[in-house]
Amino acid sequence: MDEIKITLGDLKSRRSILQGLGVAAVGISLAGLGACGKGGGDKGAAPGASAKIAPTGEEPKLNFYNWDTYIGETTLDDFKAASGTAVNMSLFATNDELFAKLRAGNPGFDVIVPSNDFVERMAPAGMIVPLDHKLIPNMKNIDPAFIDVAYDPGRKYSMPYTWLVLGIGYRKSKVKSVPDSWKPLFDSDEYKGRISLLSEAGDLFRLYGKYLGKSVNDLTPADIATIEKMMIKQKPFVKAFHEDNGQDLLGKGEVDLVLEYNGDIAQLMTEDDDVDFVVPKEGSQLNSDTLCIPKGAPHPKNAHAFINYLLDAEVGKKITETILYPTPNAAAKALMPAEYKNNPVIFPPAAAMAKCEYAKFRPDMQPLYEEAFTRVRAS
């Protein structure tokens, strides 16, 4: 398999922004995080990362398929130092891309990071394999609320890596008031040419459904037809349908409002105090990104060792300091400062979260999302 080993210096989007900030990397409302490892330029391994990992008997190699800006600054090097196993990391931008890459067969990945609804989609299709919990003792660090989940009861196929919520990232100086509704993005010409929407079909259609007062899990073919017409009407006002880089468009001033994940905007806010994030009043979609082993993984023992390593408390803390997403790792969260735990972008207010839902994979609807969005893009 043609794989490229990615080092943090190779990543040119928001992770490189964070690294370039040095001591000031976690500023504004996240300022207190600067003292807890990432700030101050500490490049050393996390204490939990230094313990040696017993050899698995496999060749010292692991192929990791991950989202961009979604790992700690030294995590991969720390794992190599602890285990002797080198990690080759490739990047994907959407779950659709991940699924397409694996649909015809695993090209050689050992660990992948699908979202919850794609775990539901891939497990019945035999695309991911059951995990051996005996090889993942750090599972004990996971908050019990994330163990027996509807999309993967008992965590047979996946380990939780992060959880996240979609909302609106915006430039405060460019809006008349806080855009606390989906309307400016979905149903208005107020910010013509200054908005960007996600390009993942299912997420976008489900969020339009929330705007229309629907559950993300109750859309019908008639709803899809209605939403498709709305999207086509709105398309002339949309600057871009982005993949995993909406925060970059906002940061560069190319757009003023963007549909993005809270962690991505939290990262951007560390260097730009004119940026903020809101979960719209109609509610939104929650996601949980997970660690899975795809069928045909060439190094399954190394994969288990790597997943277990990522669930270590200190390792998880270092990852969380970098990516600024909510963590389901209770042991790691306990090590984080109050500035992280109490940040309303990373952990939105309870009133906003009460109207948010996890999306379920619906095999009857997924083709409709994709076909309708293809027509929208072509219109």
Q: Where do the model's predicted regions map?
A:
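Early extracytoplasmic/lumenal segment of secretory-pathway proteins
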Residues: 47-121
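Bacterial lipoprotein signal-peptidase II cleavage site
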Residues: 36-46
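Periplasmic-binding protein-like
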Residues: 164, 224-233, 239, 271-297
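Conserved C-terminal helix/tail region of periplasmic/extracytoplasmic solute-binding proteins
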Residues: 350-379
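A ligand-binding cleft/hinge motif common to bilobed small-molecule-binding domains
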Residues: 118-123, 251, 257-274
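Extracytoplasmic ligand-binding site segments that recognize negatively charged/polar headgroups
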Residues: 65, 70-72, 108-109, 113-254
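N-terminal secretory signal peptides
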Residues: 1-13, 23-31
